[in-house]
Amino acid sequence: MKYNTRLGEIEINENEIITFEKGIPGFEHLRKFSVISLKDTLPILWLVSLEDENVSLPIIDPWIVDKNYEIEISNEDIKELEIEDKEKVAVWAILTIPSGHPEETTVNLRAPIVINMEKGKGKQIILDTEKYKIKHKLSEFSFQE
């Protein structure tokens, strides 16, 4: 099926749709998303809304940012996302890229997006740790691509 997004018109297969039952904080009214890869922005990917073409969030693999990144998914979240196989789980961190000032980009390592790729279910979880912040300057890290 074709969808209009901020990144242009894209073709999304049914198995590429990710449902966020409670939305994403700040976008609670939106439930259907997909992850889009653009060659020009790698390693940054895009979590695009399939319900509001103006919403697309830049995301990145947190282990590219911090190779020692640690995440513990609660039993409650495992149950909610119906995770049976941890190998089928994707984790992304949301980036904030200030308009006109990409050098000030921050990454949210405290509240990653967790997706059960097998079931197409996603959720932004908040890690129970003080180790990570909601706004880490991306420039503080050396990339581990």
From Swiss-Prot:
GO terms for cellular component: cytoplasm. Acts as an anti-CsrA protein, binds CsrA and prevents it from repressing translation of its target genes, one of which is flagellin. Binds to flagellin and participates in the assembly of the flagellum. The gene is fliW. HAMAP family: FliW. The keyword Chaperone applies. Belongs to the FliW family. This is Flagellar assembly factor FliW. Keywords: Bacterial flagellum biogenesis, Chaperone, Cytoplasm, Translation regulation. Interacts with translational regulator CsrA and flagellin(s). One of its GO terms (biological process) is bacterial-type flagellum assembly. InterPro entries: Flagellar_assembly_factor_FliW (IPR003775), Flagellar_assmbl_FliW_dom_sf (IPR024046). It is found in: Cytoplasm.
